[in-house]
């Protein structure tokens, strides 16, 4: 098994030949300029020269993290889409990939939600402003209130109180460890709901890219969603020949692509009046089945506390070097004072 340690080093000399700064002449504390690391093989090879103390990292002191996106009333958020790219950037952040878009939020109770719908269409690409803070823990996507802001959210998890205390950051959100095997009741419910045969690649949202013209007027007209899955249906509202709303009435299962079949509604639609409806494909098996891939947890945060509880760590010294080392080995255990005759 591999072992990892947080280390600190490059202590600041005080001018006197103290043990902490022995053999070095730089005095970065007086200039208040911490020496910057150098991106070179030489720097990496010699980074161990100034390491002084280390602390072993346990699973309790490391978490996956994602960018922190706080829910704020009056702000806009982007919807989860499986097809953000350089040619189809997210509308608000202009992200070339999903993980750089603001498609999830952290609420005031440290609950995390994915945005399934924000009222956006091809005629309203930025979507609506969010007015209702999501607070529910329902397994199915839901609206957060009665303002009519058009937002639909999917609850994923709640940051635990212990993680808030240990890892709280203004820049990042911690994600629970061991998602696929966790026995936490709330995590298990969300995970199993996403993993269930019923929710296997189940569709939750259809985006109206183009409302079209000439369609048969009517509210709640049910149509099939075709593709490599089965069983999905949608209810379509048409007013004055234009599609104004599409709601998934049956999510089906097994979809990696989908096409809304408007054949029963388009008898009077011209070639230039055809609508474009895009079923949004969920992540993996379904929302919540694997939050690491759904949220893009490509970073970790590590907690390590150095104090004088063992009486061998100088708490009155500043350090300019911090890092992580894998499988360190002991090269010596004793310090021997050089002989006066040594040259």
Map each language-model feature to its residues.
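Tryptophan-rich substrate-binding surfaces of secreted polymer-degrading and adhesive proteins
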Residues: 1-198, 274-276, 286
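Conserved, function-critical positions that sit in or immediately flank catalytic
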Residues: 149-337, 341-343
């Amino acid at each position: 098994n591999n072992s990892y340690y947080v280390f600190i080093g490059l202590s600041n000399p005080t001018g006197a030949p103290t043990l902490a700064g022995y053999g070095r002449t730089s005095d970065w504390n007086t200039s208040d300029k911490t020496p910057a690391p150098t991106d070179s093989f030489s720097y990496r090879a010699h980074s161990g020269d100034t390491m002084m103390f280390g602390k072993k990292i346990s699973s309790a002191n490391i978490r996956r993290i994602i960018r922190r996106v706080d829910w704020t009333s009056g702000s806009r958020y982007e919807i989860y889409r499986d097809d953000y790219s350089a040619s189809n950037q997210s509308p608000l952040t202009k992200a070339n990939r999903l993980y750089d878009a603001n498609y999830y939020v952290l609420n005031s109770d440290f609950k995390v939600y994915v945005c399934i719908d924000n009222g956006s269409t091809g005629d309203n690409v930025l979507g609506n402003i969010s007015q209702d803070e999501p607070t529910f823990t329902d397994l199915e996507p839901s609206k957060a209130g009665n303002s009519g802001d058009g937002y639909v959210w999917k609850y994923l998890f709640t940051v635990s109180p212990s993680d808030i205390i240990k890892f709280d950051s203004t820049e990042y959100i911690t994600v629970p460890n061991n998602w696929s095997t966790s026995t936490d009741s709330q995590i298990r419910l969300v995970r199993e709901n996403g993993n269930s045969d019923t929710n296997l690649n189940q569709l939750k949202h259809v985006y109206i890219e183009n409302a079209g013209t000439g369609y048969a007027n009517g509210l709640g007209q049910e149509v099939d969603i075709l593709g490599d899955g089965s069983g999905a249906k949608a209810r379509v509202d048409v007013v004055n020949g234009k599609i104004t709303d599409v709601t998934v009435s049956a999510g089906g299962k097994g979809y990696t692509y989908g096409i809304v079949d408007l054949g029963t509604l388009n008898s009077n639609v011209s070639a230039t009046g055809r609508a474009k409806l895009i079923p949004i494909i969920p992540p993996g098996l379904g929302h919540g089945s694997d939050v690491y891939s759904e949220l893009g947890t490509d970073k970790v945060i590590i907690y390590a506390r150095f104090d004088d509880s063992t009486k061998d760590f100088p708490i009155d010294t500043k350090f300019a070097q911090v890092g992580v080392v894998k499988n360190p080995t002991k090269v010596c255990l004793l310090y021997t004072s050089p002989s006066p005759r040594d040259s």
